[in-house]
């Protein structure tokens, strides 16, 4: 290999030097490739990606200097183009060959040097080169077909100035895939059909003009004379007759038209008045139906606390007697004569109640009088028997309730009841009368049960059995 001009190596010298080792010659510095012809400037975008790919894959920084002129690239490209498109202009074959050879020569002249593993690189570069040339050529052909200023027989490979690279790629895509380009003609847009309003048969008809009246009168006569005359012929004849008509006859037709117009206005006013008279009741009813929906029946509000306690058996007369400071004995008899509670109330009592009877006072009692505390109040009149707690349960309820300490008595001791009355409680029977106990209880002596006001302690949750009247001995 001669050292006179190492940068310019012929293709044959590069090809023949493959058998020699890499140590026989010096690798010249890489120089940028010569610029292609102006006709191939539009192909630079497509080839730049493939060249960079090939450069990145080359090992040890060595670039391929293989001769592509011995390959039959034009035949491959022509066969591919024929398979895709079906036909090719014969005048463009030399152009394709010139582009391929000039591109390969420019590529090889600036990149001499051997490379290991050339077959794989050769195959990849050939496929990339053929695809890029095919896409570019298809874009050129589609650009010529789409209103290109150059004549169809021209061999120039430059596209029209109005086309761009993106348009060429899109056109090539539509050509290769066989898809149709969507139509963008604004005149082909579907027009929305206008819906005609239905005319009311009761609406009065508009009056016609004077010429229309004359046309009606003369149309029948013309049709009788010329049965084969078309509507256009009849219109021409009527127009000529109207022009030749005298002014007085025209005024007669105009007066008829004015009279018909006045009648039409009167009929139209009456028709609109009838519409107005019919529409308000219907619209008013619809508005009333919307504004006043049927009222929903709301159930009566239930009381928050079901308290069938003292309020159920204290009548206004009893409260009035209580306010008027009646005798405690009469009040006790009234309370005892009424049914206290039909059963145990499970609902909580109201938070504040003026009368909250407390448990009977915890006073020291003799042993024989303990059983009388557990018995319910005696009934002075026939009344339904309320359910009564057994003695142990009543005792537990009394122990569970925290009685307030005995305070000052607001009422004197309640008078006793007759000793012959029996008890309705299943507890122990009344003890036998003894001479130690008097029949009456003066206000100064001790008593077994009292009624007092207790505003501080909450009322009991069970039926009030706190007003206890023991049977006297």
Swiss-Prot record:
Biased composition (Low complexity): 153-164, 373-382, 415-440
Tissue: Highly expressed in ovary, where it is restricted to undifferentiated granulosa cells. Expressed in hypothalamus, pituitary gland, testis and uterus.
Residue spans of biased composition, Polar residues class: 8-20, 463-473
CDD domains listed in its UniProt record: HMG-box_TOX-like
Molecular function as annotated in GO: chromatin DNA binding; RNA polymerase II-specific DNA-binding transcription factor binding; transcription coactivator activity
Biased composition (Basic and acidic residues): 171-188
Cited InterPro entries: HMG_box_dom, HMG_box_dom_sf, TOX_HMG-box_domain
Basic residues: bias regions: 189-199
Gene Ontology annotations for the cellular component aspect, listed alphabetically: nucleus
Pfam families for the chain: HMG_box
Subcellular localization: Nucleus
Region annotation (Disordered) ranges: 1-42, 139-211, 277-302, 340-473
Motif (Nuclear localization signal) on chain: 172-201
Covalent S-S links between cysteines: none
Region (Required for transcriptional activation): 25-63
Positions of the DNA-binding region: 204-272
SMART domains linked to this entry: HMG (SM00398)
GO biological process, one term: response to gonadotropin
Keywords: DNA-binding, Nucleus, Transcription, Transcription regulation
Function: Putative transcriptional activator involved in the hypothalamo-pituitary-gonadal system.
Record protein name field: TOX high mobility group box family member 2
Gene: Tox2
């Amino acid at each position: 290999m001669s050292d006179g001009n190492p940068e310019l190596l012929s293709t044959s010298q590069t090809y023949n030097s493959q058998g020699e080792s890499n140590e026989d010659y010096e690798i010249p510095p890489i120089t940028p490739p010569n610029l292609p012809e102006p006709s191939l400037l539009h192909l630079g975008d497509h080839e730049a990606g493939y060249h960079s790919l090939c450069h990145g894959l080359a090992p040890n920084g060595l670039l391929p200097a293989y001769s592509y002129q011995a390959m039959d690239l034009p035949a491959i490209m022509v066969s591919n183009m024929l398979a895709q498109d079906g036909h090719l202009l014969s005048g463009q074959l030399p152009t394709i060959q010139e582009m391929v050879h000039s591109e390969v020569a420019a590529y090889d002249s600036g990149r001499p040097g051997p490379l290991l593993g050339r077959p794989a690189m050769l195959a990849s570069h050939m496929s990339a080169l053929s695809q890029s040339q095919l896409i570019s050529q298809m874009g050129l052909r589609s650009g010529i077909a789409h209103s290109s200023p150059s004549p169809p027989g021209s061999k120039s490979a430059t596209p029209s100035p109005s086309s761009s690279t993106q348009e060429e790629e899109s056109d090539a895509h539509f050509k290769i895939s066989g898809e149709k380009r969507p139509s963008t003609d604004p005149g082909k847009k579907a027009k929305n059909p206008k819906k005609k309003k239905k005319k009311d048969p009761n609406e009065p008809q508009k009056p016609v003009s004077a010429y229309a009246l004359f046309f009606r009168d003369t149309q029948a006569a013309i049709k009788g004379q010329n049965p084969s005359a078309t509507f256009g012929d009849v219109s021409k004849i009527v127009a000529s007759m109207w022009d030749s008509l005298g002014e007085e006859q025209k005024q007669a037709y105009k007066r008829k038209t004015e009279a018909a117009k006045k009648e039409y206005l009167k009929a139209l006013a009456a028709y609109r008045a009838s519409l107005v008279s019919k529409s308000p009741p219907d619209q008013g009813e619809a508005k009333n139906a919307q504004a006043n929906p049927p009222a929903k029946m709301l159930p009566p509000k239930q009381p928050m606390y079901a308290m069938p306690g003292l309020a159920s058996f204290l009548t206004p007369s009893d409260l009035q007697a209580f306010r008027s400071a009646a005798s405690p004995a009469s009040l006790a008899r009234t309370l005892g004569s009424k049914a206290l509670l039909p059963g145990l109330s499970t609902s909580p009592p109201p938070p504040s109640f003026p009368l909250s009877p407390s448990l009977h006072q915890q006073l020291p009692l003799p042993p024989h009088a303990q059983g009388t505390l557990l018995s319910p109040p005696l009934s002075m009149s026939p009344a339904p028997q309320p359910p009564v707690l057994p003695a142990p349960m009543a005792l537990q309820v009394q122990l569970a309730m925290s009685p307030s300490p005995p305070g000052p008595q607001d009422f004197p001791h309640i008078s006793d009841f007759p000793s012959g009355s029996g008890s309705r409680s299943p507890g122990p029977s009344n003890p036998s009368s003894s001479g130690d106990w008097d029949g009456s209880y003066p206000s100064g002596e001790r008593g077994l049960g009292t009624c007092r006001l207790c505003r501080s302690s909450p009322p009991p949750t069970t039926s009030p059995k706190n007003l206890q009247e023991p049977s006297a001995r």
